[in-house]
């Protein structure tokens, strides 16, 4: 247990620049890759021609990712289990297996999965420091070309703790989704 605490302090010092050095995106990736379980409550706003807002509860465990819709009330209780290359939608004891869209991480069901995967495994095209809603933050930009579309994610994490704060999702420079993290427990 002591080794784990020391490792976390070292990773966070690298993330937060305890020595006054610039933030290292590799330290951020190391922190997220080392997380064994995560719970995130988030607000997701989708703008793909019509505006839609969702409140979700996301949980990552060794078995996979799980998302439950909290809001709007008309969809509350719908759950999705997300595994590599597939998902299962569950409601009121019934389940339906489904495929994820070709551009993974760009729909509300797998937005948090994609955000965490980029933070853990991605190499940001750009990163820098800025303030976000009163928090000293690090912004990381991840870009991929998918199916002839440029997919970009901007992800802000709190500088001192590494806690995710916000993400914006762009397809061909048009913002299609935002994720605001309300609670993060690792």
Question: Which residues does each PLM region occupy?
Answer:
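Flexible, processing/modification-adjacent segments and terminal tails
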Residues: 23-24, 31-34, 42-44, 89-146, ...
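A mature extracytoplasmic/lumenal domain signature
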Residues: 44, 71-73, 82-84, 93, ...
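N-terminal leader/targeting segments and the immediate start of mature chains
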Residues: 12-64, 74, 185
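Gly/Pro-enriched, hydrophobic low-complexity segments
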Residues: 128-186
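An acidic-aromatic
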Residues: 57-111, 175-177
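Short, surface-exposed charged micro-motifs
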Residues: 55-57, 77-81, 128, 152-156
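Sec-dependent bacterial lipoprotein signal peptides
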Residues: 1-17
């Amino acid at each position: 247990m002591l080794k784990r605490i020391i490792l976390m302090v070292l990773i966070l010092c690298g993330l937060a620049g305890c020595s006054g050095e610039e933030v290292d995106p590799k330290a951020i990736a190391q922190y997220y890759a080392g997380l064994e379980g995560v719970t995130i409550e988030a607000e997701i706003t989708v703008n793909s021609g019509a505006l839609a807002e969702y409140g979700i509860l996301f949980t990552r465990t060794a078995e996979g990712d799980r998302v439950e819709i909290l809001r709007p009330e008309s969809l509350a209780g719908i759950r999705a289990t997300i595994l590599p290359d597939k998902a299962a939608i569950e409601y009121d004891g019934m389940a339906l297996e489904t495929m994820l869209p070709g551009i993974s991480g760009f729909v509300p069901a797998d937005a948090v999965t994609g955000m965490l995967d980029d933070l853990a495994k991605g190499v940001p095209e750009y990163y820098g420091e800025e303030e976000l809603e009163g928090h000293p933050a690090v912004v990381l930009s991840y870009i991929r070309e998918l199916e002839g579309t440029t997919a970009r994610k901007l992800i802000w994490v709190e500088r001192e703790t590494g806690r995710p704060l916000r993400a914006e999702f762009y397809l061909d420079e048009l913002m299609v989704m935002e994720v605001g993290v309300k609670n993060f427990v690792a």
